[in-house]
Amino acid sequence: MAPTIQTQAQREDGHRSSAHRTVPERSGVVCRVKYGNSLPDIPFDPKFITYPFDQHRFVQYKATSLEKQHKHELLTEPDLGVTIDLINPDTYRIDPNILLDPADEKLLEEEIQAPSSSKRSQQHAKVVPWMRKTEYISTEFNRYGVSNEKVEVKIGVSVKQQFTEEEIYKDRDSQIAAIEKTFEDAQKSISQHYSKPRVTPVEVLPVFPDFKMWINPCAQVIFDSDPAPKDVSAPAGVDMMSQAMIRGMMDEEGNQFVAYFLPNEDTMRKRKRDVEEELDYMPEEVYEYKIAREYNWNVKNKASKGYEENYFFIFRDADGVYYNELETRVRLSKRRAKVGAQSSTNAVLVCKHRDMNEKELEAQEARKAQLENHEPEDEEEELDLEKDMQEDSGEEREKPSDSENSESESEREEEERPADEDEEEEEDEESVKRRRERKSSGSESGDDRQARDEEEIFGSDDDSEEEEEEEEEGGARRRSNSSSVQHSASERASDSSDASDSD
């Protein structure tokens, strides 16, 4: 075929058309290709056919030491595909007000069970082994019977059967039997873990209530940061924190806050001397503490909403493990210093130790009685007292009708009896009143408990007034006791004179 010859106009037209192209075509050949003859497509799909001959029959390739020692470069990104912004922490913070995609909301939906009260659902819940489960039945069966195939149901079958077979805590006898069974189970030796057979105990210690320290109410104080002083070494800081005190205070604006006091050097020496001499404190000794931090406080006790019981354990050498109750939880957060407000960094707390007063001893006895649970119910005691008084009055009524010849003696007894009855009634009323006070102290209201917690944790400023009142009450009580003793002595003298007259 004869070659074609392009004119100058055709070349210019070709250049104009190629100028409008965005991506120019590149060819591996330097000269212009006049003819293109591309290979046709393969008429059939590729197939994998096993090669029947040995691959190493012509040549056996063996890598040289140069290839083995060559270290190939790992062309990977420096962050390995995990982009983490270490400068701005807000990069990965999730906005709680963001709207979820409707497709993702299904992941947060709870599994809603189909209503099982209908007759149709009850029929589909039945498993019929001899019936062939076709496809249109299986979908319907899975819809109604999915609750029977859950793992939770399979695991809880044995527990459910155990509770249905044994009716525990049904009546008083079963409760007593269950309580006695706990004591029997406690006597059994522990050989292995209840759920991990391969775990064996290293040491077994008995656990008891802490009868020694239960009379003192304990509180858990949680700091938002370490309150240790920064300018003191770690061992010395621990010693200072072991002697630290917290106290409620009020600023000039009337805002309450908690002050954290640390002992000064003189107080540390005094406390160290007390420990060496095995003394709780030295009488008439003054201990000074300097304020270290100021906190805002939040208190939760048994009367607070959402309160959770909290206990702690005490390990005593060769004596066992004892647990005690943390009935108050105090959270302390740092208090921001206000601009222009007078700082209280120079505040000093001066402490003197004293013996417990009668009110504090009664509170300790109430806590001890609450632990021992030896207080009988007040209603039963009142009923018993009423029965005893009725029986005594019935016997007194029957005595005059026994004999008519002893009229003078019965008259004398009736004259003597009202005084004794009055004394017995007064004693009974005092005992009932004392029990009611004990019960009221045991079941105090939320406000009283909160006030008591604040007084126990942060102290009271009315100690001196209470001591003066107690001294006055003690003197009055001693005077009343002496007068009652004289009155009883005079009564005994009158009784002896009456007896001699009757003889």
UniProtKB/Swiss-Prot annotation:
<dbReference type="GO" id="GO:0005634">
    <property type="term" value="C:nucleus"/>
</dbReference>
<dbReference type="GO" id="GO:0000122">
    <property type="term" value="P:negative regulation of transcription by RNA polymerase II"/>
</dbReference>
<dbReference type="GO" id="GO:0003682">
    <property type="term" value="F:chromatin binding"/>
</dbReference>
<protein>
    <recommendedName>
        <fullName>RNA polymerase II-associated factor 1 homolog</fullName>
    </recommendedName>
</protein>
<dbReference type="GO" id="GO:0000993">
    <property type="term" value="F:RNA polymerase II complex binding"/>
</dbReference>
<dbReference type="GO" id="GO:0007507">
    <property type="term" value="P:heart development"/>
</dbReference>
<feature type="compositionally biased region" description="Acidic residues">
    <location>
        <begin position="375"/>
        <end position="385"/>
    </location>
</feature>
<feature type="compositionally biased region" description="Acidic residues">
    <location>
        <begin position="453"/>
        <end position="473"/>
    </location>
</feature>
<dbReference type="GO" id="GO:0014032">
    <property type="term" value="P:neural crest cell development"/>
</dbReference>
<dbReference type="Pfam" id="PF03985">
    <property type="entry name" value="Paf1"/>
</dbReference>
<keyword id="KW-0539">Nucleus</keyword>
<dbReference type="GO" id="GO:0016593">
    <property type="term" value="C:Cdc73/Paf1 complex"/>
</dbReference>
<comment type="similarity">
    <text>Belongs to the PAF1 family.</text>
</comment>
<feature type="compositionally biased region" description="Acidic residues">
    <location>
        <begin position="404"/>
        <end position="430"/>
    </location>
</feature>
<comment type="subunit">
    <text>Component of the PAF1 complex, which at least consists of cdc73, paf1, leo1, ctr9 and rtf1. The PAF1 complex interacts with PHF5A. Interacts with ctr9.</text>
</comment>
<comment type="function">
    <text>Component of the PAF1 complex (PAF1C) which has multiple functions during transcription by RNA polymerase II. PAF1C associates with RNA polymerase II, is involved in transcriptional elongation and in histone modifications including methylation on histone H3 'Lys-4' (H3K4me3). PAF1C seems to be required for multiple steps in cardiac formation. Involved in the migration of myocardial precursors to the midline and the differentiation of the atrioventricular boundary in the developing heart.</text>
</comment>
<feature type="region of interest" description="Disordered">
    <location>
        <begin position="360"/>
        <end position="503"/>
    </location>
</feature>
<keyword id="KW-0805">Transcription regulation</keyword>
<feature type="compositionally biased region" description="Basic and acidic residues">
    <location>
        <begin position="360"/>
        <end position="374"/>
    </location>
</feature>
<feature type="compositionally biased region" description="Basic and acidic residues">
    <location>
        <begin position="386"/>
        <end position="402"/>
    </location>
</feature>
<feature type="coiled-coil region">
    <location>
        <begin position="352"/>
        <end position="381"/>
    </location>
</feature>
<feature type="region of interest" description="Disordered">
    <location>
        <begin position="1"/>
        <end position="23"/>
    </location>
</feature>
<dbReference type="GO" id="GO:0006368">
    <property type="term" value="P:transcription elongation by RNA polymerase II"/>
</dbReference>
<dbReference type="InterPro" id="IPR007133">
    <property type="entry name" value="RNA_pol_II-assoc_Paf1"/>
</dbReference>
<keyword id="KW-0804">Transcription</keyword>
<keyword id="KW-0175">Coiled coil</keyword>
